[in-house]
């Protein structure tokens, strides 16, 4: 018997289908129009060019390294915050962890250079003791450092809810069995983290993969160029819309493939309803070594993230602060930015609701 047409289900699907169709038409149409404006629209020549292949390899390599560093470092820091849910300033620190995400990238890069550059604050402090850190801020090292600055706090905030998935019964059972801190992480905490890890890895990887301003300012040369920067170079310096369109499509294809592979490779678990993390039911929070490790991890992470921000604030206070605040151009730019942000947020919200 032929099933009846489900009208209600269709009306529930059409908003998402319309939004998806509009996005597909916008992306494909824009790239096709840009590529059609070029007389050198050759996919094979562009994709198999040695320079383009090197750019693709470097893009994937730096995104992979940045993701591994950010996520691996985020796990112990997030665990430290989870094991110490009550201490003075905890909420403020977690809230301020969102600053790197909303900061202008170029401004943040200036702060990173001011702290970790050759003549930065870190080497200035160590110099009287005869110590220096030979950190090459321009090149792959600088890119990884900047990506970690932006994505480490994001990964921490995204993974913190994982500990709320662990039930009180699990903690009590672990306490009864006398589990060590390492056993707790392996058998109790890791299954909860695994439910959040795929999403965190995909988000951080795609942010690093499509990074533009960081690579443009800290890349240091053609050997440290990503696809995003290559697109900019093709339009700005070579004026080759065809090559830019091919590179953009290639980046889109690689992003989709990378996200699908990462989600498939990493084990995805369904989050289980737990309870708010209670320090009184964890069997590993009372030891002195555990407290030192947790607060040490929180302190080091806070210094790493907030030092560039503090350097920017101090530099701004030493500048012509009053004249900048009274500059009408500043407020016009702020109003323009606010208008664009509100419009983009509204459109994104409506489209996301439809999808």
Residue spans of the language-model regions?
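Solenoid-repeat scaffolds in large eukaryotic assemblies
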Residues: 174, 243-244
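Membrane-water interface segments at the C-terminal ends of transmembrane alpha-helices
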Residues: 7-41, 50-164, 192-219, 244-263, ...
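Cytosolic juxtamembrane amphipathic/interface segments immediately preceding
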Residues: 2-12, 51, 182, 279-286
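Glycine-rich helix-loop "coupling/hinge" segments at transmembrane-helix boundaries
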Residues: 114, 213-239
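Short helix-to-coil transition segments within interhelical loops
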Residues: 166-193
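Short alpha-helical segment immediately N-terminal to, or the first helix within
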Residues: 45-46, 162-163, 187, 217-220, ...
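A short amphipathic helical element positioned immediately N-terminal to and/or at the very start
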Residues: 3-4, 41-48, 320-325
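Alpha-helical transmembrane segments of integral membrane proteins
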Residues: 261-297
């Amino acid at each position: 018997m032929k099933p009846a047409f489900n009208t209600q289900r269709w009306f529930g699907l059409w908003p998402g289908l319309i939004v998806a169709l509009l996005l597909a038409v916008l992306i494909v149409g824009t790239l096709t129009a840009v590529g059609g404006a070029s007389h050198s629209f050759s996919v094979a020549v562009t994709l198999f060019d040695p320079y383009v292949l090197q750019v693709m390899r470097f893009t994937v390599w730096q995104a992979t390294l940045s993701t591994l560093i950010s996520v691996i470092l985020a796990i112990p820091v997030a665990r430290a915050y989870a094991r110490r849910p009550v201490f003075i300033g905890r909420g403020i620190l977690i809230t301020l962890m969102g600053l790197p995400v909303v900061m202008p990238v170029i401004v943040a890069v200036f702060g990173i250079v001011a702290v970790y550059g050759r003549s930065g604050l870190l080497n200035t402090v160590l110099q009287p003791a005869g110590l220096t850190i030979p950190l090459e801020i321009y090149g792959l090292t600088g890119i990884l450092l900047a990506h970690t600055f932006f994505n480490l706090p994001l990964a921490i905030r995204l993974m913190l809810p994982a500990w709320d998935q662990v039930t009180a019964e699990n903690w009590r059972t672990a306490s009864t069995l006398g589990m060590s801190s390492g056993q707790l992480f392996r058998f109790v905490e890791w299954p909860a983290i695994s439910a959040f890890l795929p999403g965190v890895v995909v988000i951080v990887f795609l942010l690093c993969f499509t990074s533009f301003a960081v690579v443009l300012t800290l890349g240091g040369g053609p050997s440290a160029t990503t696809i995003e920067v290559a697109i900019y170079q093709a339009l700005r310096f070579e004026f080759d819309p065809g090559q830019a369109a091919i590179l953009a499509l290639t980046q889109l294809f690689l992003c989709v493939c990378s996200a699908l592979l990462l989600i498939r490779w990493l084990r995805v678990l369904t989050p289980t309803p737990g309870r708010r993390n209670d320090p009184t039911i964890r069997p590993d929070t009372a030891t002195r070594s555990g407290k030192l490790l947790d607060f040490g991890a929180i302190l080091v992470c806070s210094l790493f993230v907030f030092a560039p921000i503090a350097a920017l604030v101090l530099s701004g206070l030493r500048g012509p602060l009053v004249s900048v605040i009274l500059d009408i151009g500043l407020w016009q730019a702020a109003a323009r930015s606010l208008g664009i942000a509100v419009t983009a947020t509204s459109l994104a919200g409506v489209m996301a609701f439809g999808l």
